[in-house]
């Protein structure tokens, strides 16, 4: 775990991030404080991609070491949530001990995105404000329009897949099939959308340790709405019932 945290922290610091704290095996970080960072959305997203690339290399290294590590280490994954917006930063704590940290709704949503990424079976979930600031420099999946736990307003979210020009093998077909299914879903064509999501599910990369994927999570939604149509006033959002 210390090796993993060292590798991830090195990437964070090399890409202009500020380390807030470690919470167990989690890394909390931000950009733009205490010193301003130009293009901070790009640096945050680049950090996330580089972390995933390095973790993939580490998995191979750990697996090559055989029985030194349990099999769960060979398939170690992480999740990252990214959001952009105002936050409060500064020294916070008691008169005996303080920590330079951050707080606010922006931070809360980023934490919710990290947690809910597991429901989609993805590594990196990014809010729209961050995505649109560097949209042309990365490959994205138009993931969802959701109300996360603890919020009342829906948020547009994306899966960050890779840097532009580095499309993973087969992902062009996956994204095309997925986008077609989402379009049918948003137009309330539930039966056709269900068939389309099942087709895109067949294309999804079910790598070791992955239990679901974005295509698969839409299928029960289509079944639900087929039996309980949301009506003409539906904004396309879905309320998550767990973090």
Name what the model sees in each region:
Residues 1-47, 97-100:
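Catalytic NTP-binding/metal-coordinating core of nucleotidyl cyclase/transferase enzymes
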Residues 4, 23, 40, 47, ...:
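Helical mechanochemical/support elements of P-loop NTPase systems and associated helical scaffolds
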Residues 7-8, 25-27, 48-55, 78, ...:
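Cytosolic nucleotide-binding catalytic cores of signal-transduction proteins
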Residues 8, 44, 51, 82, ...:
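Hydrophobic, well-ordered secondary-structure elements that form the walls
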Residues 30-40, 80-100, 117-120, 161-164:
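Catalytic strand-loop-helix junctions within cyclic-nucleotide turnover domains
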Residues 53-86, 109, 114-145:
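A short beta-strand->alpha-helix segment at the C-terminal rim
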Residues 87-89, 116-192, 198-231:
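Cytosolic regulatory/linker segments at or just downstream of nucleotide-handling modules
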Residues 230-243:
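Intrinsically disordered, low-complexity, charge-biased linker/tail regions
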